Each structure stands twice: as structure tokens, then as C-alpha cells.
Amino acid sequence: MQQICVLGSTGSIGISTLDVLASHPDKFSVYALTANSSIDLLVEQCLKFSPQYAVIRDEALYLPLKQRIESLNCTTEVLAGEQALCDVASAVQVDSVMAAIVGAAGLAPTLAAVEAGKRVLLANKESLVMSGKLFMQAAKAASALVLPIDSEHNAIFQCLPQPYTSLADAGVQKILLTGSGGPFRDTPLADLSAKTPDQACAHPNWSMGRKISVDSATMMNKGLEFIEACWLFDATPEQIEIVVHPQSIIHSMVQYVDGSVLAQMGNPDMRTPIAHCLDWPRRIDSGVASLDFFALQGLDFCRPDYQRFPALALATSAIKSGGTYPVALNAANEVAVALFLEEKIKFTDIAAIIAAVLEDWETCEPDTIAAVKEADAIARKLAYSVAAKFGY
């Protein structure tokens, strides 16, 4: 019986994870559930899964959550704050940690799980974007098993031989990272500035949280995944090619030196990669319907349009520049997306703000997580300063 800690259980990935776990009560038990501020849903989840701990990141919500839990005669113990997140993620009782907290907020608890040598199901791409070298070094030192949950990286993982050592040893010529192009793939460029948060969050294929939905609309999500893939698979930027695939049926591909291309296919549902990683190397039922090849209308592919998606170009440039450029990229993006979702800036301002932050950025090679966090804080402050010039 695996003991599971779900970091970010009230988010899109967390909810999908619990859906899979509920189907396999003989295999998995929930040790801890965590949320940022969604008390109502967290209470519901505690009543259903009876975890030993429930952690709320916002310490101001500790008492309200504790009172709710106690009033329902639930035996779950309530904790609060970032340190509590790190504690449950690294607890000796825990076998696997689903790292599904969105954004930079997920770095500390995810790293705590890695340093404790856990089996880490990585859905928090920002951990690798911000601290890729340090993160992978920590995983190696602690013998932690990092399994990718992002559908694209999970697809690549499935297409690579195991055990995997390097692209060269595996005979890999190129990784083909696919992306749908989001809801604005065919929108006239002149119309992009008027797009609303609700329009940006209406993804044609995937059901996701609002932040990642906006990232998909700008294709920054693919840019962050590009950086993540470099670290996960020890690849250079030149060894990864982004392919726009509108149907989201092929989740990524690996091209080998002998001319073969292996692709992982399936209906667009995050429960598939979640189930794949939860009991890897064994396969379990995810609850996702099998792909009906006879119902497919076709599979299309094209190159990304960097004029339409300047955020994607900024991301690929950031990993090539190295240092703390990816940290600044991620921080500026989180600030800009939050302002856009609050309707304080235009959709096209997101990439413009990121570009302005990177243009003024003074990079260094961070040798500690503290240095990464310091760079993150500086970049956020700079992003707000830049955003003020856009009317915020």
C-alpha cells in the first residue's frame, strides 16, 4: 500500500490525481492533502480520503480550516504554512509525492520531497524552470525518482528506453515536443490584444486551471515545458523541436538516429500520465477512454509561429542564455498572467512585460536555492514596475 502526499490537491492536477486514487483503494492511501486557500474543497477531500494531515499554505486560514474539520468529526490534523508543506512532503511515512502546486510556490515542498529521496510525480514544471541544475543534482544525491506528469514529458519518458542514461546512449536524434497552439492559434494577430481572460482560458482540448490555460494561450506553457525537458532528459535546446499539433492526440515524440519515430498517443486527459506514474513501471486503469482511431478526423502538424507567440521565443532564448534568465522569465510570467486574469493588462502585454524584464536582467549562476529565490523576488518586483508602464 503506497502512502501518497498530494501537494495542491484542490487544483486541476490534484483533483485528477484523487480521481485515480479513488479507483484503486487497494493500492494507495492518502497521507496528506494540501491547498493554498480552497478550504471548502479541501474539507470535502478530507472527508472522502481521511488523510492524516491537511495543510493550508495561507496561515490566515488555519483556524477556519481547523474549526471546519473538527466540527465534522474528521480526524485529519490541520497544519499551515510553507514549512508544513515541506514537512508532509518529506515525511518518513510517505512513499510518493504528487507535486502539483502551480508556480514558484511549489518549489520548496517539491525540493523537500526530492531531498528526502521520495518518488516524486512532478507536475510543477516551475521547479525545474527555476532551479533545474540544483533540482536534478539534489535528486541524484538523494536517489529520488522523478517521474514527469506533464503529458508531453510523460510521453517522452514513455518513448525512451528504460533505464534511461542519455540521449546519445539511447540513439536519440531529437525530441519532438508537441503543443496544440491553444485557443488563439488561428486568431488574427490584430485581434489578440482584445482577448479576455475567459477567452484565453477556453482551451479547445484540455481542462486546466486558469494560470496554465493562459500560459497555453500565449504558448509560454510550451516554453516552460521546453526548459523542463532540457533538464529532465539532459538535452540541449538544439536537441528539442517544438511541433504544433492542434488535435492534442500525440502528446510528444522521440526521433531516433535510425529514422524511427516513437509517439505516445491518447485522449487528452491528465489522468493518463497520472496513472502511468502512480504505479510505474506497472500500468493501472486511469478511467480514461481508449483512443478511437476510426473517429479521428486527422492529425495535423506545423511549426510554431513566433510572431504570434513571442512568449515562446522568450522562453527558448532564456534557457539558451542560462543563469537566472529562466528564473526571471518564470517570475515575470507569473506576475503578468496574474495581472491579466485580474483584467489589469491586455493579453498582448503579457509577453511585452516578460520581454522588458529580461531585457534589463543581470544574470548570474545560482549555486543555492536561496539565490534562486532571491532572483525570483527581484524579477517579480521588476515585473510589477514594468507593468505599471502598461497602465497597471
Swiss-Prot record:
Mn(2+) binds at residues 150, 152, 225. Its cofactor is Mg(2+); Mn(2+). Gene3D superfamilies: 1.10.1740.10, NAD(P)-binding Rossmann-like Domain (3.40.50.720). It catalyses: 2-C-methyl-D-erythritol 4-phosphate + NADP(+) = 1-deoxy-D-xylulose 5-phosphate + NADPH + H(+). InterPro entries: DXP_reductoisomerase, DXP_reductoisomerase_C, DXP_reductoisomerase_N, DXPR_C, DXPR_C_sf, NAD(P)-bd_dom_sf. Keywords: Isoprene biosynthesis, Manganese, Metal-binding, NADP, Oxidoreductase. Pathway: Isoprenoid biosynthesis; isopentenyl diphosphate biosynthesis via DXP pathway; isopentenyl diphosphate from 1-deoxy-D-xylulose 5-phosphate: step 1/6. Signal peptide: none annotated. SUPFAM superfamilies: 1-deoxy-D-xylulose-5-phosphate reductoisomerase, C-terminal domain, Glyceraldehyde-3-phosphate dehydrogenase-like, C-terminal domain, NAD(P)-binding Rossmann-fold domains. 1-deoxy-D-xylulose 5-phosphate binds at residues 125, 151-152, 180, 203, 216, 221-222, 225. Its EC number is 1.1.1.267. GO terms for molecular function: 1-deoxy-D-xylulose-5-phosphate reductoisomerase activity; manganese ion binding; NADPH binding. GO terms for biological process: isopentenyl diphosphate biosynthetic process, methylerythritol 4-phosphate pathway involved in terpenoid biosynthetic process. NADPH binds at residues 10-13, 124, 126, 209. Catalyzes the NADPH-dependent rearrangement and reduction of 1-deoxy-D-xylulose-5-phosphate (DXP) to 2-C-methyl-D-erythritol 4-phosphate (MEP). HAMAP family: DXP_reductoisom. Belongs to the DXR family. This is 1-deoxy-D-xylulose 5-phosphate reductoisomerase.
